[in-house]
Amino acid sequence: MIRIRFGMDVLLVLLLATCLLSPTHGTPLEWDFAVTLRTKIQFMDSSWQTIATAAHEFDELSALTFDESEELIYFNDLKHRNGSIFSLKRDLIAANHVVEQTIARTGNESVAGLAYDPLTTNLFWSDTEQRKIFFASIHGSATPKVLVDLSAEGGRPDGVAVDVCRRKLYWTNSNVTHPTVERIDLDGSNRTVIVNSDIDMPRGIVVDQLSDRLFWIDDLKGVFFSVESSKLDGSDRQVVLKDKHHEPLNLAVTNDAIYWTDRTTRSVWSHPKVPVIRVTTTSKPEEEDSTDATDFKDPEPVAEDCPLVRVANLSEEARGIVARTGFYQRLQKDHHCASIVRKVKQRVDEQSRKFEVSSLLDQKMKVLENERCMNNGEYKAATDLCICPTGFKGSRCEIRECHNYCVHGTCQMSESAYPKCYCQPGFTGERCEVSVCAGLCLNGGHCRASKEENEAPTCECPAKFGGARCEQNSTEICSLFCRLLKHEPEMYVPFGCHSICEELAQGNSTNIAVPQYQHLEVCLTPTVWTSSVIIILVVGIVSSLLLVAVIVHGIRRLYKPKRPRIRKTFVVRKQARTNSAGDTPLTNRPLATEQCEITIENCCNMNICETPCFDPKLVEQTLSKSSCKEDKKILIHNMEDDLY
């Protein structure tokens, strides 16, 4: 029995693993956009292909919002008898959706906008009938509380949006007599009007956490509408789009585009958040007999007209819309949102621990679930969702966002957790897919891209063309001067046009005049090496050589060693030396009663001269009176005397 039980457990584990690890189709998990129609919720992927539908049991859906932390959709039904707001989640076992009542109906509510705070798990909604904004927790059955009451002032709250990171609620007041865009802290304090001018009937509103900006729809008078944007405090207001023949209700924002629902065409439309910049050149056709000079200027960047794109045609009236923003991955490093993301993650982790069990089967299932998420992704059993680390995406974190993203460059993840390309020299664009030389040089010019990052590319123009992009045809310009010169002989003509005018005059001398320059031969053959230049150059070289010689001679005199100083030493012996036995008058000099020896150093060309001194007193007197030269003469003279 034990063996059979164990085999059944293993078989069950394998079957469940197959369900977990195999891709699921037709379920709301893989969606990127969700749209509420009148009787259903439609889920679509990034290419706006329908992958699933849900909530078919309802009759009058309106607003919706998305809790990305727990993969929950919250929506409203205007005609349900018991409930007002419901939640939709995916069933892990049946691979289907489950709808539960979240907020009970208390009267004739007319919900226009929904927003969710994942930190406090509170829902916020606007009621156009009661002219109030309510909030309530999704856990428990407490009576909803009023956050903002606009009934006394005649306001009409419409769209609502929660700034999760800065803990504020934004809403639009669509009262046509006094429309506004306002905000308030989530605790009900610090109510502020941020936009109250040049606005007609604001509808949907959304907070873009990636760019720290607000986006809202304004249903203008007549058939016009606009999409506007501002900073979170209402400053730096911009009109992103203005068009007509739409009846927009709600909008959603992604990293690069804005999407909104249109009740008139039953469609979803899109427009870029930032206009695309392109470079255009406008050329004016030149007439043959024109006499007006044309100024050639470098082209300037022009904002390209971004047309509206209908991304989805729907079978019913389109109302609410939400988009997946990557709350966990994109805001982990944002200095405003990092702490909030961490707290939300802790709350979800604590809730996930309630599902943990210790049986053998559950342990094996947990191993398989953890293996479902690749690249260190974190598996959430409560939502069957992989929370991917920065740089990875996909239902199993199997896709590296930088893989093949940059065409000619290096990809790195930015602080906003989006791939960013650092382009090689010569390429630009979001993915380094555009060459800086593409279409730059005209008329056969050759483009050279600089190796420096901030240096613009240059064009090497062929003969008779010039300008930054070789857009200036010197032949055409000079032909214009040559024609004008025929009618105005005193007009100035650039020197480079002389040869061109001569060529044109050979075939059409009646309409072309050749400019006559004074001293043309000087301009054509300039002589650089004149006699005066050569003389100045020679004098300069000779002066330089003399200066170098003087400097070298002075250095040698400065560092030449000094002559040694003559020193004299006198040694006097009072006792005469005794003659030896071999001394004779012929071999030895007569001995005096007193004898002195004089040792003179550094004289006689650095030799030591030893000479007898027969009159020390005379020498002493002489030393005190005579100079060194006289001493030398006396010594030499005494050596030559006959002493015998």
Swiss-Prot record:
GO terms, molecular function: calcium ion binding; Wnt receptor activity; Wnt-protein binding
Keywords: Cell membrane, Differentiation, Disulfide bond, EGF-like domain, Glycoprotein, Membrane, Oogenesis, Repeat, Signal, Spermatogenesis, Transmembrane, Transmembrane helix
Function statement: Has a role in spermatogenesis and oogenesis.
Gene source species: Drosophila yakuba
Disulphide linkage map: C402-C411, C406-C421, C437-C447, C441-C459, C461-C470
Gene Ontology biological process terms in this record: canonical Wnt signaling pathway; oogenesis; positive regulation of circadian sleep/wake cycle, sleep; spermatogenesis; triglyceride homeostasis
Name of protein: Protein cueball
Extracellular side: 27-531
Recorded topology in the membrane: Single-pass type I membrane protein
Domain EGF-like: 398-430, 433-471
Cytoplasmic side: 553-644
List of glycosylated residues: N82, N108, N175, N190, N313, N473, N508
Signal sequence interval, chain numbering: 1-26
